[in-house]
Amino acid sequence: MAGHSKWANTKYRKERADHKRGKIFSRTIKELMAAVKMGGPDPKTNARLRMIIQKAKDQNIPNENIERNLKKATSADQKNFENVTYELYGHGGVGIIVEAMTDNKNRTASDMRIAVNKRGGSLVEPGSVLYNFVRKGACYVPKSSIDEAVLLPHVIDVGAEDLDNDDDEHFLVLCDPVELASVKEKLTALGVACSEEKLIYVPLRLVDCDEQDGEANLALIEWLEKIDDVDEVYHNMA
């Protein structure tokens, strides 16, 4: 799974989890602004905006932050955000996928080049890494809210494909992307709390690394994750 590896020690994983919480906040705000650009600032007539506002509230983003960014999104000089994906090979043949949401693709591309210049690896052509991954829907269920033995029968009942427990804080209920909304709704009806649901990349095969390559890949991944525009980094390192 993304970001979980035998080379990642407890301190690294805790720092990464703390950093990702900030990334989730930032991503939701960018999605909100993009939704306003696409469909207007009124959630009554903009269904996507209405959904993202609810998502922001579920993530405990303060109402004043939501309102401030709604106003900012209507500004004439506010640029449009777009999703971009980069593919890299890290050390020891490990594949890395980077998802970003940016209002300046040139800036983001420059940040990616700086990352590989500083931490190694190489940017590659589209499709060079993606073929080693599959797109899945994922419902994030806090481990503090339910035992795995209790959750597993529910995963089967709602028609999900798998339950992944590699993440330190969440169980990931995996499903076909087109079934994500349905699976989330069914889990909620069963009393299972989903803190987030989204599409992710899951590796089809894992690559074993020696210790030197493993540590070098973690350094590269950490650098990539700290790029402002980057939302998610996936890899297939064992």
From Swiss-Prot:
Its main location: cytoplasm. The keyword Transcription applies. Signal peptide: none annotated. It comes from the Bacteria. NCBIfam families: PRK00110.1, PRK12378.1, YebC/PmpR family DNA-binding transcriptional regulator. Belongs to the TACO1 family. This is Probable transcriptional regulatory protein CAB166. It comes from Chlamydia abortus (strain DSM 27085 / S26/3) (Chlamydophila abortus).
